[in-house]
Amino acid sequence: MNYPQEKIKPYNADEKKSVQVEKMFDNIAPAYDQLNHALSWNIDKSWRRKAINWLEPFHPQHIMDVATGTGDFAIQACQTLHPQELIGTDISEGMMNVGREKVKAAGLDSRISFAKEDCTALTFPDKRFDAITVAFGVRNFEDLDKGLREMHRVLKDNGKLVILELSEPDWFPMKQLYAVYSKIVIPTLGKLLSKDRSAYTYLPQSIKAFPQGEIMTDIIRKAGFNQVSFKRLTLGICTLYLATK
């Protein structure tokens, strides 16, 4: 099935979305962390913590962090969960290069590694991981259904899937305030700090188009997962999705 966000691309209508997303993140990689924390007022750190805390009772030893970017989630997860290995995958080498430096600085390079992977065609064998995490990345998938099915394939039986994704508040006045923030503040700050206005115009557009709440949980179930649930965080600005294979 095609979803609205799959048609939204950072730069033009001609090139494949995955190619443009890779180019976009390579472009903004140097400024990404600063801008990401600024735009979320550092609340993104607490969102990651909630996702990681849900995984803690299951003691996953082999974790894949999809769309790992600069490794923020991977580092935080490794420090809390202490897995044997954590593999961060992404299509952007620019983002992962920043992540590799951060992992080395944190002294975690013996446990965290990075691999360039297309989430819709993973190179890992079936039932490879105890847990898979995706923080702020699923709306960039070129094919959401295919990406979810691939994650299901490489998860062990009873393995856990955790997805964090930005979302739109749906109640007054937060919905109206968020609309102004996303249409004016995000693109303006994005242009100032990253020099790539298109990337931060694409961000709110892709959030608006992405399936949320019950619709997203139905999509996750269709990929083969069960025990699917979601929690809205910070007045609905972010949503946490939880599932089991």
From Swiss-Prot:
What pathway does the UniProt record associate with this protein? Quinol/quinone metabolism; menaquinone biosynthesis; menaquinol from 1,4-dihydroxy-2-naphthoate: step 2/2
* SUPFAM superfamilies documented for this protein: S-adenosyl-L-methionine-dependent methyltransferases (SSF53335)
Q: Does the keyword S-adenosyl-L-methionine apply?
A: yes
Give EC number(s), comma-separated: 2.1.1.163
**Catalytic activity field:** a 2-demethylmenaquinol + S-adenosyl-L-methionine = a menaquinol + S-adenosyl-L-homocysteine + H(+)
Entry-linked InterPro entries: SAM-dependent_MTases_sf, UbiE/COQ5_MeTrFase, UbiE/COQ5_MeTrFase_CS
Keywords recorded for this protein, A-Z = Menaquinone biosynthesis, Methyltransferase, S-adenosyl-L-methionine, Transferase
- List the Pfam families hit by this protein, alphabetically: Ubie_methyltran
Q: Which domain of life is it from?
A: Bacteria
- Similarity comment: Belongs to the class I-like SAM-binding methyltransferase superfamily. MenG/UbiE family.
Matches recorded under PANTHER family: 2-METHOXY-6-POLYPRENYL-1,4-BENZOQUINOL METHYLASE, MITOCHONDRIAL, METHYLTRANSFERASE
For this entry, the protein name equals Demethylmenaquinone methyltransferase
Question: What organism is recorded for this protein?
Answer: Phocaeicola vulgatus (strain ATCC 8482 / DSM 1447 / JCM 5826 / CCUG 4940 / NBRC 14291 / NCTC 11154)
